[in-house]
């Protein structure tokens, strides 16, 4: 498997948008909608490729914390992972881990923290992935109860 960073081109945008449509069709994330080009603009993009086909992606952006918190001081440089997606056939094979680790190495010179949010319906699996496998710390939770 080849993992690399790529500049956003028309071809790359088409690939990411097609994969995000597949992700939306899976229906495994609350409120997820497929990307359009504007969702990708200004992002750093990392791809996982196998046998010439893109099997996963991670994209995100750098930012500075606007307010201080119990975790980080105001103006702390961070990198927000907007999306990390791996095609179903390549899940649990290390592609997501490899994408995250590659992006971590690439962004860490300019970011004190990597942050992300998730809306997956399988929260146990995603927390296992991010906390147990990748070593992220749990910081915040937003829960909901549908009443009607």
Regions inferred by a protein language model and the residue ranges of each:
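Conserved acyl-donor/pantetheine-binding loop and adjacent beta-alpha core of acyl/acetyltransferases
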Residues: 59-79
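Short amphipathic alpha-helix that is part of the acyltransferase structural core
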Residues: 1-32
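Conserved acetyl-CoA-binding loop-helix of GNAT-fold acetyltransferases
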Residues: 86, 92-105
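Conserved GNAT acetyl-CoA-binding A-motif
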Residues: 107-119
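Conserved beta-strand in the GNAT
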Residues: 47, 53-62, 80, 85
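Short hydrophobic clusters on alpha-helical segments that form packing/core surfaces
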Residues: 81, 103-107, 126
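Active-site rim helix/loop that mediates acceptor-substrate recognition in acyltransferases
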Residues: 24-49
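Conserved catalytic-core motifs of GNAT/GCN5-like acyltransferases
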Residues: 65, 117-119, 127, 131-148
């Amino acid at each position: 498997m080849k993992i690399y960073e790529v500049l956003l081109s028309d071809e790359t945008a088409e690939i990411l948008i097609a994969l995000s449509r597949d992700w939306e069709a899976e229906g495994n994330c609350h409120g997820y909608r497929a990307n359009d080009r504007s969702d990708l603009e200004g992002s750093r993009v990392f791809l996982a490729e196998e046998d010439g086909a893109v099997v996963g992606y991670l994209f995100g952006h750098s930012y500075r914390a606007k307010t201080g918190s119990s975790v980080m001081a105001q103006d702390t440089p961070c990198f927000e992972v907007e999306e990390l997606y791996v095609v179903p056939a390549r899940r649990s094979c290390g592609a997501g881990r490899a994408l995250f680790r590659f992006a971590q190495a690439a962004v860490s010179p300019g970011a004190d923290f990597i942050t992300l949010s998730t809306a997956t319906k399988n929260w146990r699996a995603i927390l296992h992935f991010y906390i147990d496998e990748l070593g992220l710390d749990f910081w915040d939770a937003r829960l909901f109860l549908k009443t009607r």
